[in-house]
Every structure is written in structure tokens, then in C-alpha cells.
From Swiss-Prot:
The keyword Chaperone applies. This is Regulatory protein ViaA. PANTHER family: PROTEIN VIAA. Pfam families: VWA_CoxE. It comes from Photorhabdus laumondii subsp. laumondii (strain DSM 15139 / CIP 105565 / TT01) (Photorhabdus luminescens subsp. laumondii). It comes from the Bacteria.
Length: 485
């Protein structure tokens, strides 16, 4: 069976122009035009998919087989194409019969040409073949358009699903063009999922919008950067000037009172002690210790002294922003409103990760660990699975932090920021684990953040974190926040 690409090649049909035409028609559709006007960032992300669409359409044409009747007609055309005049007239009745049997669009015109009285037989043969070729090109082009039209409708249906999902999530996720592009890529994995999954993402994004302080807290945490001092490799000698005090040879004037053993400058009170027999030994003791009160004469000389000393320069460098490893406490005390806040906070960090091209990994810790990779190609699917979880487990913070440290050892999680969301009502951490965390903070510049959802968290546990972010979910705090907004 002849493929469509082969037929295009033999008939010199430019399939690239037809693909360009079908894509332009697709982009000009009213559905896309309205969406592009509303979400310009997603438009730029969608336009990056055009080369992929062209490749897919070319592959579809390459794999397509032409109809049997068209293949039979083309093979008959090839046989006559190189035939001489005698053979052409000999086969002409069979050609007309075959064209009529397969119901070729060229059949009627072929009958008219065959009955036409043209004196030159070569002219009739040339005209017949030219008209037949035009008919074959027209049939092939029509088949092309039918095939591409089917692909366009299918692509438009998929785009409408992606546009609906991306458009709903655009306000919460698309902070810049990079975030819009990653959101568009991740929306591909959501096409076959239920409407409930999509509504779950929208529900938590709306909840986050209702909690502006929680959203602001995520912004502060996500955008924070630590600064580290980096010593320069080369040491330099720099002149250092100091002031030295040296005694002057010639005293000039009385400048105060001091302690010395200078008999000539004794104060009268000291001479009076010498005249009292009971205090005479006290006078000699002060004399030996040079503690007699005497007049101090101005005779000190101060001069500058410059020496070369080695100096090490330090440069302040901002630590590069790394990925997020978010540890979420799913114990019973983190249920209800705490659960909603924790999930919404994770969505806010995912927004920052998409905007800054950072990875985002979630670990749910109870008595075990459940992992979700939110920045993967199926990130939205992972996010809906995470949001559908319920918090009814226990609390094993030590095991979660140990797993986080192991995760940080992987190359792709270098310079990661660990974020622990909990009420921190948990058991005391082992000393060995605390020592590991301190080493990571001190020597490898890793940062550990605590997001406390309760005012009753244990200070001993939270002391290991670089930053502690408080978001009290108690009834009083919730009412105060609602009253303020």
C-alpha cells in the first residue's frame, strides 16, 4: 500500500504548506483568540508548542495510508505515464473502464477526452495525462485536508481542555512567563482526569486567596536568601597605622596627679605621712611599689607607627536559591483548618517554584513517608493526589528530617531549602540528628525553615531551625485576621 508521503513526493505536493495553513487556522479560531486576550502569558507558552504540533502532523501524514481506490488509480497512472502512443490507445478502453469502476472523479472528464477528435494522437495522450495528474493532485490534497482537519479538531479539543485548566489555575500559579510555561507543560497530564481533581486545585487556590497573610508568609519564606562570607584565596599585606606613646625627655608643665616613686614631686599629703611615726612604714611600702601620689608633668610624646600586616578579605555572596523540600505533618492535631492551611501553603510554594524554575518536593510524615514531586511533568496530578489526602496519622518528625537529609545528598537537591509545616507538638529529636542538621547548616549552607501552625509548639524542637515562621490557626487569631481584612 502506498503511503501518503510517497504519493506527495511522486506528485510534488508540498505538505509543509498545508500543515502551516491548518495551524494558522487553528490559532485563528475564536475560542483561542478570546483565551489569548485574557491570558497573554499562556499564549506565549502555547506558541512554543507549535514546532511540536508540526512534527506530530508530519508524523501522522507519514504513517497515513491512502485509500485503496486512490492507490489503484495512481498505479494505473504510473503505468500509462511512460507508455508510447500505441500502447496508450491500446489500454485506453481498460483505463476508462477502471476509472468508472472505482468511481474516480476523473472518470467523466476522461470519457470526454477519449471521444474528442484531435488530429494529433500525441497531443491527446499528453493532455489526457496532464488532466489525470491534476485530478490525482486534487484528490490527494482533499485527502490531506480531511486528515489534517481531523487532527485539527482533535488538537483543538485537547487545547480547550488544557486552556480551561490552565486558565483557572493561571491566577494562582502563573507569576511570570516561566511559571506560565511550566504550568502549560504540566497541564498535559491532567487531560484525562476528572473534573473533581481540577476543582480541588481551584478550591485550595481560592482558599489561599482568602488567607492573604498565609500567602504573604509563603512569599517571605520562598524569596528569602541567606548571605555567606567567602574568604579570598590570596592574602595581601596592607599597611596598618598605630599610635605609640613614648616618654618625652623634657617635662613641660603639671598635667595632673599620678602614682610613682619620684621623691622630688611628692604631694604634701605624702610628706605628712612620712612625718607620722606610725605611718612611716606605709610610706616606704608605697615608695617601693611606686604608688606615692606625685605631680604628673606633661612629657608624653605620641607618634604614628606604620607596619605591614597580612589581611584576609571576605566577600559577601548571596546563596543561590535551591529547590524546596516540604515536610508536612499529617497527625490528627493538624486536621481540619490546619490541614487546609498546610495544603494552601504548599500550593503557594509551588507557585514560587514554578516562577523561579525551582523543584518542589513534598513529604508527608506520619509513621511513614509519602512523597510527591510537584515540579515533575505530572506535577498537577501529584498535587491533586496530595490535596486529596486526609491528616489523621501520627507524628514522626525525626524520621522525616532523616529522610530529608538523605534527599539533600542527591545531586539534583543540592542547596535545597527544607520547610517543615507542623504544630511541633512532637517527641524530642535525637542528639545525633540535631548534630547532623547543625553540620549541614554550618558547613554546607543548607537552610531549615519551620512553619508553626500552633502557639504550643515545643521550643526545644524548633531551636534547630534557621527561621521560624508563625501562623497561628487558633480561633482567636483567625477571628482577628478576618476582622482586619
Amino acid at each position: 500500500m502506498i503511503s501518503l508521503t510517497t504519493l506527495d513526493l511522486l506528485l510534488s505536493i508540498n505538505e509543509g504548506e498545508m500543515i502551516e495553513e491548518i495551524i494558522l487556522t487553528l490559532l485563528a479560531s475564536p475560542q483561542l483568540a478570546i483565551f489569548f486576550e485574557k491570558h497573554p502569558r499562556l499564549k506565549r507558552a502555547l506558541l512554543k508548542d507549535i514546532p511540536g504540533w508540526k512534527h506530530d502532523l508530519q508524523q501522522r501524514i507519514k504513517e497515513a495510508l491512502i485509500p485503496v481506490t486512490l492507490a489503484e488509480e495512481f498505479q494505473l497512472y504510473q503505468q500509462i505515464l511512460s507508455a508510447n502512443t500505441n500502447y496508450f490507445y491500446l489500454k485506453l478502453p481498460d483505463i476508462l473502464e477502471t476509472l468508472n469502476r472505482i468511481e474516480s472523479p476523473f472518470s467523466e472528464e476522461a470519457q470526454k477526452l477519449a471521444t474528442n477528435t484531435i488530429a494529433d494522437s500525441n497531443t491527446l495522450q499528453t493532455l489526457f495525462i496532464q488532466r489525470w495528474r491534476i485530478s490525482l493532485i486534487l484528490q490527494t490534497t482533499t485527502f490531506h485536508k480531511q486528515l489534517l482537519e481531523q487532527e485539527k479538531e482533535q488538537l483543538l479539543a485537547e487545547l480547550q481542555q488544557k486552556l480551561t485548566l490552565s486558565g483557572n489555575l493561571d491566577p494562582v500559579f502563573s507569576e511570570n512567563d516561566r511559571a506560565a510555561g511550566r504550568l502549560w507543560d504540566m497541564s498535559k497530564s491532567q487531560l484525562n482526569h476528572s473534573q473533581n481533581d481540577k476543582q480541588l486545585l481551584i478550591h485550595y487556590s481560592e482558599f489561599l486567596h482568602q488567607q492573604p497573610e498565609l500567602k504573604k508568609l509563603a512569599q517571605l519564606l520562598g524569596r528569602s536568601q541567606s548571605v555567606k562570607s567567602k574568604p579570598q584565596e590570596n592574602h595581601f599585606f596592607e599597611p596598618v597605622t598605630t599610635i605609640e606613646r613614648t616618654p618625652d625627655i623634657i617635662p613641660e608643665q603639671v598635667n595632673g596627679i599620678g602614682q610613682s616613686d619620684d621623691i622630688l614631686r611628692l604631694l604634701p599629703i605624702e610628706l605628712a605621712i612620712l612625718g607620722i611615726e606610725d605611718l612611716e612604714y606605709e610610706f616606704y611600702r608605697k615608695l617601693v611599689e611606686k604608688k606615692l601620689l606625685t605631680y604628673r608633668l606633661q612629657g608624653d610624646n605620641w607618634r604614628e607607627k606604620t607596619t605591614l600586616q597580612p589581611v584576609t578579605h571576605y566577600s559577601q555572596e548571596e546563596k543561590p536559591q535551591g529547590p524546596f523540600i516540604i515536610c508536612v505533618d499529617t497527625s490528627g492535631s493538624m486536621g481540619k483548618f490546619n490541614e487546609k492551611c498546610a495544603k494552601a501553603f504548599c500550593l503557594a510554594l509551588l507557585r514560587i517554584a514554578l516562577a523561579d524554575n525551582r523543584n518542589c518536593h513534598i513529604m508527608l510524615f506520619t509513621t511513614g513517608i509519602v512523597h510527591y514531586e510537584l515540579s515533575s511533568p505530572d506535577g498537577l496530578e501529584q498535587a491533586t493526589r496530595f490535596l486529596s489526602q486526609t491528616f489523621k496519622g501520627g507524628t514522626d518528625l525525626a524520621f522525616c528530617l532523616t529522610s530529608t537529609i538523605e534527599k539533600m545528598k542527591e545531586k539534583c537537591w543540592k542547596n535545597a531549602d527544607a520547610v517543615v509545616i507542623s504544630d511541633f507538638i512532637a517527641q524530642r529529636l535525637p542528639n545525633s540528628l540535631i548534630h547532623q542538621i547543625k553540620n549541614l547548616q554550618l558547613h554546607q549552607q543548607y537552610r531549615f525553615h519551620a512553619v508553626s501552625m500552633s502557639q504550643y509548639g515545643k521550643p526545644d524542637i524548633m531551636r534547630i531551625f534557621d527561621h521560624i515562621w508563625h501562623f497561628d490557626t487558633g480561633l482567636k487569631s483567625r477571628l482577628l485576621r478576618k476582622w482586619r481584612h
